[in-house]
Amino acid sequence: MRQLWTQAAVIALTAGTLGAPAHASGQSGQRFTPNFPITQPAAPPPGETIQAQPGEAESLPRPTPIPVQSAPPIAQAELPPPAPVSTPAPAPQPVLRATPPRTVVTTTVTGPVVEVAGKPQVRVVESGDALDAIARGMGSTRAELVKLNDLEPPYRLKLGQKIKGPATTAKAYVVQTGDTMFAIAKRFNVTAAALAEENDLKSGAAIKKGQKLLLPDGYKDKGPIKTTQVIPGTPATMVAEAEPAPATTRPATPAATPSRPVRQPVSEETSEPATTSTTTLSVTGSVVTVAGPRQVHTVKSGDTLTAIARKFDMSVSELAEANKLDTEKPLKLGAKIKGPATTQKAYSVQTGDTLGEIAKRFNVSVKALAAENNLRATASLKKGQKIALPDGFRDKGPIRTTTTTRPATPPANTYARVDSSAAAASTPSSPVPYTPSGAAPRPSAPVAAQPITPPPSSGRTIIETAAAPTEAEIIASGKGKFAWPLRGDIISSFGVKGTGQRNDGLNIRAPQGTPVLSSADGEIAYAGNQVPTFGNLVLVKHADGWVTAYAHLSSTNVKMRQQVKQGEQLGTVGATGGVNEPQLHFEMRYAPTVKDKAKPVDPALVLPR
């Protein structure tokens, strides 16, 4: 029982203690809520009453009030700002760059032309020649020729005797560093062979700076050679920047999803590829002075030997000797008195020249040129042969043929990387979670910049092949391998001949039955007459992709698969296939590979001159 009273006293004491702060602070009606749990004692069972003993409660000490102060509010501590995050400098990003085309001009063969002592003049005595006439032709005098040749009176000349004249002056070119015989010949509009022959050299002979090269007769100085080359620019390609951007320091932010380069078409002007112009010269021989036909006087009534000698500017003795006449006897009416030989201009033939081409250079007809030289219009010519030029000729200079080739234009890169600022502008402002593809895992590190490759086309597969050879390269590859199948007048040259018409070869006029020879070693690929308009036709397949064709033959001497050598007869000239006169249609074709279609090539640019 005592224990129960003790518990009741503790409860009352506790209640008084909890109520004291409210009265002490002067705030009634507001209770302080403890911040610890309170466990209430179990309630006494119903019906049981606990009564305190008299005097026991009074004997307990009265509790003293405890002063309570309100705790100050707890200040919320401010967190320090996050430490700045140093972002490393990004890897060099690819940028779109292109090089514009540029023009390069180089000047060569810049040496001066000087005057030097030329070779002495030489005249071979022919029938009817007189010393005085030879002296006049050389621009000299009888006395000078007598001294130069140690002649003695009465100064009789013998057939075939060589009479030396005074030395002439000539023009020469002073060689500069890097000059070649071919480049010098090009400047002075002559052939390298003619230039070498004039200087007793070989065409490919080495020359030194300061060396003087005599210039052949008929040269034309076109001045230093200027070569202009357009170097094409490079198409726009992705390249890494030369210097990476400096590192930046910024507050840490949520990592953004790495962006990828976006391929977009770029409208880009394609640079013009370099063009190559090949100029070839033909009929490049020199014009020389040769002995012309002798003057002839027909004796008329009253003529005397003295009067005729005066007309020919000869002495009576020279005229009598040249015609085997007796000065004491009278002349017969109608007799032909031969005077001194005249001089005239002639063209010195070079390899590959024809009467037709020579006539074109000197602005005369083939018929007149052939008649002046007692030749047929289709006659073959030899190097060094002198072709007399008819009266009224006009020298237009060597024939120039210019061929312009343009290499294939490389495909331009039409894809470029979109600028990062533009890509950022289209990025949503709210974060978008990145969902990696199952096929390609998300990269965990920056990806190195790679060149952007255009996506494959949906059309046919494109197979990359080596660039096709240019026309100049094709011509160079055939030089020195082929020979003319025959010689004659070219009546139709290579190229376009009118609206819708084109000649893929050369038509060479020649007499019926003239042998047609193989241009080079090879195998007979075709021999027959089944190709319309070509008549009897022979095709020869050669090494390195070359094929030659020989059409309008009157007969053929070969069969399929037969091996032939250069110069071996294939057939004879005819007029089969619808042509109206005997001729040979000759073609040269080239194919880089067996899969390529053979392309016609101008034989005049490949065959020797």
UniProtKB/Swiss-Prot annotation:
Entries under InterPro entries matching the protein: Cell_wall_metabolism_enzyme, Dup_hybrid_motif, LysM_dom, LysM_dom_sf, Peptidase_M23
**Cell location:** Periplasm
Keywords on record: Cell cycle, Cell division, Periplasm, Repeat, Signal
Q: Which SUPFAM superfamilies match?
A: Duplicated hybrid motif, LysM domain
UniProt note: phenotype after gene disruption:
Deletion mutant exhibits morphological defects, including cell widening and filamentation, and cell division defects. Inactivation causes severe defects in outer membrane invagination, resulting in a significant delay between cytoplasmic compartmentalization and final separation of the daughter cells. Cells lacking the gene also show outer membrane blebbing at the division site, at cell poles and along the cell body.
GO CC terms for this protein?
A: periplasmic space
Asked whether the keyword rRNA-binding is assigned, the reply is no
Share an example GO biological-process annotation for this protein.
cell division
- Cited function: Required for efficient cell division, cell polarity and normal cell morphology. Facilitates remodeling of the peptidoglycan layer and, thus, coordinated constriction of the cell envelope during the division process. Plays a critical role in maintaining proper cell envelope architecture during growth and division. Required for normal envelope invagination during cell division and to establish or maintain outer membrane connections throughout the cell envelope. May serve as a regulatory hub coordinating the activities of multiple peptidoglycan-degrading enzymes during cell constriction.
Q: What is this protein called?
A: Cell division protein DipM
